[in-house]
């Protein structure tokens, strides 16, 4: 199935997409109007669609669930809306893609509530505002079995 996502990265965003794909872990420090959220939402979508894993799981995590909804949910729906057989779960802020991939938007306000999840890829937005244990104690173990670069 040929899928066209309605997103054209700017020059520096295209560079980042390329570099992120070459590394296991990436940290981006970009100016306020760089387009980080749109860039990373589209990176998650592409990674989920191209994943060779069976039913891959991806997450976008911001400091709070409310922030994920207000900042990223509309973008997620906008950029996946034209993908045939895509399903949206408004309550859980989840997109189920036709290849079995799932992208969920999460909040880190109860980081212990994220323990035990499995992830193939993840984006943490506003990293300075999440609990310091989120990545080393919760997200890194969730990604430990995955070799996907995101």
Give the role of each language-model region.
Residues 1-148:
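Phosphate/NTP-binding elements of NTP-utilizing enzymes
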């Amino acid at each position: 199935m040929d899928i066209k996502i309605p997103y054209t990265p700017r020059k520096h965003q295209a560079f980042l997409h390329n570099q992120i794909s070459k590394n296991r872990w990436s940290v981006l420090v970009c100016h306020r109007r760089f387009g980080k959220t749109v860039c990373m939402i589209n990176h998650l979508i592409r990674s989920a669609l191209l994943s060779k894993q069976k039913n891959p799981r991806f997450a976008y995590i911001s400091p709070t669930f409310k922030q994920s909804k207000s900042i990223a949910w509309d973008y997620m729906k906008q950029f996946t809306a034209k993908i045939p057989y895509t399903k949206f779960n408004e309550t859980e802020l989840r997109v189920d893609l036709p290849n079995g991939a799932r992208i969920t938007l999460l909040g880190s306000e109860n980081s212990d509530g994220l323990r035990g999840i499995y992830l193939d890829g993840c984006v943490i937005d506003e990293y300075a505002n999440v609990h310091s244990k989120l990545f080393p104690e919760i997200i890194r173990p969730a990604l430990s079995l995955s070799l996907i670069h995101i």
